[in-house]
Structures are given as C-alpha cells and as structure tokens.
Swiss-Prot record:
Pfam families: CBM_19 (PF03427), Glyco_hydro_18 (PF00704). Changing residue 23 to S: In strain: DBY939 and SEY6210. Its main location: secreted. This is Endochitinase. It comes from Saccharomyces cerevisiae (strain ATCC 204508 / S288c) (Baker's yeast).
C-alpha cells in the first residue's frame, strides 16, 4: 500500500462527520441564523466553529407551498424563477455537519406568505420539502445544492394551524427512507396552547419545542409558565421524549421584552427546570445577537452554555450523592472504616397552619397578604408537579428561620383576583413533606413563590384588600345559585363583551383581558397587544373551583360563563 494512498485514507477519515450531537442532553443550545437582526451576522460556518451552539435553524423558508427563501444578506443569487440559490450556505451546512452540528430549515417567521388550504396540500408539500432540501430526487432546483438539512422547524406565526400536523406526519414517513437521523421542531409562543402550532404539537411527533418566553406576558421575569409546558410534554405530546427549550432573546435589541441580563436569575431559573428529563436546553434569537452581545466581556451564548453545563453537572452530582447515601445506609454492618453519607432529607416534626389564597383573573386589583408567625426552622426538599393552567407545589422550607413575611401582589397579576380570607389552625405531626396546593397566575416582582404557604405552629391570618371591577361589569347573567367565582367570571365576561378590557383607560404591564371579539389581550408597554386564540377556542373568563381564569378556552363552553 503506497504512502500516498494511506495519506488519502487518513484525510478522508478526518473529514468524516463527527456526530457530537446528543439529542437526549439537557445542555444543548439552538440558535436561529439567517435574518441578521443585529446587523453583524457572520457566516453560518463561523458560528458552527463555536462549541457553544449545537443546533442551527436556517431562517427562513418564508413562502410556501410555492417556495420562497429569505436569508437577509447571506444569500442573493437566484435560479431563473427567483428562488434563492445559496452555494455558500450549502458549503457551510456541510461544514457545520462535519463539526457535529445539526442544521434545520425553519419554515415561517413573523413575516411571509405561507398557509395550507387543507391537509392534502400540506402532505403534497412534504414531498416538495424532501425533494428540495432532503434526500429526495424529484426537484430540479436545490437551493443548497447537494447539501441535505437535518430536519425542519415550524416557526409558524400566522395563527393558522391548518395542515402542519399532516405535514409533519408525512415528513416522518419520508425520513424513514433516508440514510440518517432527521428531526422536527416547533417554536410556539409561551401562552398555551399556541394559536399557530398548538395542533401540530398535540398531534405530531415533534423532537424539540423552542418555546418563546419573550414578547409575551409569560417570561422568566414574571408569570413563567414552564410547568404548563412540562405537563404538555409529559401528558399531551405524542412524543413523550420531546425536549423543551427555554427560548430567549440573544440581547436587549433582539426582542421587545423578555431579555435577561441578570445572570443570577438565569442561573436559578436553569437550575429549577434543568432537573426534568424533558428539559433540552436554551433556544436563542438569533445568532447575530447572541454571539455579539457580551456581558462582562463574555459572549451571551457562552454564558448560557456554561450555566447549562454547570446545572447539568450539579444534577449529576446530586444523583451520585443520593446513590452513595443509599448504599451507605444499607451497609450498616460493614467495618468501621467505611465512610457513611449524611442524608440530605431529614424528618421534621412540626405543626402546620394552612391558609388558602385563590387568585383569579382581574382587570385591576391589589392584594396585600400579611403572614405572621413564630420563628421556625424546617428542613426538607421541594418538588413541583403541574397540570395545564394549574401549578401544584409540594413544599417545605429549607432550614430557614422565619419570623414574619409580607407578600404584596399588585396589578402585575395577569388575572382578576378572588380572595377568600380564612383563618384556620390545624396541628399535625409528620416526618413527610406536607402538601400545600397553590393555584395562581401572577407576575411577581422577584422570582419567588407567588403565594407563600408556611409550615408553622401559629395561625396565619390573611388580610386581603377589596377587589373591585368596573361598573360596566356588573350586568352579568349571574343567579343567586352561582358561586362567588362563577359570579366574578360572568361579570368579567360582561366587561370583556362590552369592549372594556380591564375597565380602565390605561393598563399595567402584564395585565391580561379579552377583547370583545374573543382575542387574548396582553398589556405590553402600556398598550394592549391582541393575539388570536387557537382554532376551536376563544378568550373568556371561567371558574374552576374557587378560582377564576382569563385565557383562551374551548368555544363550546363559553355560554356557561355569561
């Protein structure tokens, strides 16, 4: 065998793709690339050389079913019919893939011309995508030449759900004909369910959900509804292994709201959500923003990658410590030279005082809750469960001495408030965590539990202020048999139907309401922003138990609350 032949073989080996991507990891970062939102966009290959990003989303295929692409300043050459022909992007795709990155083509975007008339048209379009960007052979024009993307992302923002579930299902059948692993992802807005891809997420096999916690009332800084999406992943998604990504702006200029420069808040948030097997990492808009934005001289994307890695290592260490502790406990008869681990969860004998605060949607309300008790030190752990729209927390406080606490909920609460004052004292002795159910939707000023329930031997007294609605909301169809919550829901719906939103001439950041025509309304920078509800749903207030909610809900149930 000649030396030249050996060198050629070695060179080819070096050029083989290094499949470093781990779909099951919780440290992945996905970035959208192509729209040059910061004005400093570099080539796709340049960003792929960084170890801080793992998934690249080419944005966008913004016209379909008749194809139209837009990559800002990254591509301008076209075929004779006007479709972009991007030879440099094609080369970069293959470079990225050789570095172990996954490259998906994103469909949609905030602006564009795209929709399907029915499922049949969407299924036909699946073949077009496969032939034009995948391993199919039926297309005469391939914008990326021989380069083959690793899948498709649905960043649909036109509030039209028709066809996408059928498209995704058909793509799955075509992927089965391919020679590599393909992925499908979606980028829903954080309000659940999303008006554009809600049906897709509920009925199709999606690998990643890049949830946009920005430009919405729900964000990390307030009304963070991650638990709602976690419940979706675990109970609704056809793919129980779907990975949820925390979608964030790459800088302050990347979005109107939702950017987080507070690294301590980022760290605590990631630590809170990274322990779930459904957590996949962080998604960023966009590469030009996230790589050029620096905090204390460090690129934002690098900061986030380090936080993800740290959280993952902490979780791994915790599991290892727990296993060691268990082994030590079960080996009590071993020699005295053995080192025992101290259990991190200890039994606590305590008495409990329960007080329930039920928070519900309102246009204007201020709730002041005063909690007073004696000093008490507790040791335990916290575990959170959730269902759509409801958060149930089983918790005790971790070794803290509390003498008094005062919680003030202002008009940042997204929904009206129904507060039932009650003073109850119940004494129990237990070595297990005490379960306290909390139902709330609010926008706290700091990242803390919205409603505080403390285990203490004294009585907790809650003193709410008066909740009022505008005079226009009193003309409801409530009857004497209605519960207090049902009456409030009807009053709010009468207010919404009259076009009065929150009943005031101004709104407070984060307030929510419904428009007269059933749109979901959110106050953003002192102005109402309207969003269409998903197909089959409309916006109204409704009650559940002692709580009242304002959000998109099934249309056929609306008449029960008027």
């Amino acid at each position: 065998m000649s030396l030249l032949y050996i060198i050629l073989l070695f060179t080819q080996f070096l050029l083989l793709p290094t499949d470093a991507f781990d779909r099951s990891a919780n440290t992945n970062i996905a970035v959208y690339w192509g729209q040059n939102s910061a004005g400093t966009q570099e080539s796709l290959a340049t960003y792929c050389e960084s170890s801080d990003a793992d998934i690249f989303l080419l944005s966008f295929l913004n016209q379909f079913p008749t194809l139209g692409l837009n990559f800002a300043n990254a591509c301008s050459d076209t075929f004779s019919d006007g479709l972009l022909h991007c030879t440099q992007i094609a080369e970069d795709i293959e470079t990225c893939q050789s570095l172990g990155k996954k490259v998906l083509l994103s469909l949609g975007g905030a602006s564009g011309s795209y929709l399907f008339s029915d499922d049949s048209q969407a299924e036909t379009f699946a073949q077009t995508l496969w032939d034009t960007f995948g391993e199919g052979t039926g297309a005469s024009e391939r914008p990326f030449d021989s380069a083959v993307v690793d899948g498709f992302d649905f960043d649909i923002e036109n509030n039209n759900e028709v066809g996408y579930s059928a498209l995704a299902t058909k793509l799955r059948t075509l992927f089965a004909e391919g020679t590599k692993q393909y992925y499908l992802s979606a980028a829903p807005q954080c309000p659940y369910p999303d008006a554009s891809v809600g049906d897709l997420l509920e009925n199709a096999d999606i690998d990643f959900a890049f949830i946009q916690f920005y430009n919405n009332y729900c964000s990390v800084s307030g009304q963070f509804n991650w638990d709602t999406w976690l419940t979706y992943a675990q109970t609704v998604s056809p793919n129980k292994n779907i990975k949820l990504f925390l979608g964030l702006p790459g800088s302050a200029s990347a979005a109107g709201s939702g950017y987080i420069s507070d690294t301590s808040l980022l760290e605590s948030t990631i630590a809170d959500i990274a322990s779930s097997s459904s957590f996949g990492g962080i998604a960023l808009w966009d590469a030009s923003q996230a790589f050029s934005n620096e905090l204390n001289g460090e690129p934002y994307v690098e900061i986030l990658k380090n936080l993800l890695t740290s959280a993952s290592q902490t979780a791994t260490t915790t599991v290892a410590t727990s296993k060691t502790s268990a082994a030590s406990t079960s080996s009590a008869s071993t020699s005295s030279a053995s080192t025992s681990q101290k259990k991190t969860t200890q039994s606590t004998t305590s008495t409990q005082s329960k007080s329930k605060v039920t928070l519900s949607p309102t246009a204007s309300s201020a709730i002041k809750t005063s909690i007073t008790q004696t000093t008490k030190t507790l040791t335990s752990s916290t575990k959170t469960k959730s269902s759509l729209g409801t958060t149930t927390t089983e918790s005790t406080l971790n070794s803290v001495a509390i003498t008094s606490m005062k919680t003030t909920l202002s008009s940042q609460i997204t929904s009206a408030a129904l507060v039932t004052p009650q003073t109850t004292t119940t004494s129990i002795v237990s070595s297990a965590p005490i379960q306290t159910a909390i139902t709330s939707t609010l926008s706290p000023a700091t990242k803390s539990s919205s409603v505080v329930s403390l285990q203490t031997a004294t009585t907790s007294t809650l003193s709410p202020t008066t909740t009022s609605t505008s005079s226009g909301s009193t003309s409801s169809g409530s009857t004497s048999s209605d519960s207090t919550a049902r009456t409030l829901a009807k009053e709010l719906n009468a207010q919404y139907a009259a076009g009065k939103l929150n009943g005031k001439s101004t709104c407070t950041e984060g307030e929510i309401a419904c428009s007269a025509d059933g749109k979901f309304a959110v106050c953003d920078h002192s102005a109402w922003v309207y969003m269409e509800c998903a197909s089959g749903t409309t916006c109204y207030a409704y009650d559940s138990g002692d709580s009242v909610y304002t959000q998109c809900n099934f249309s056929y149930l609306e008449s029960n609350y008027f």
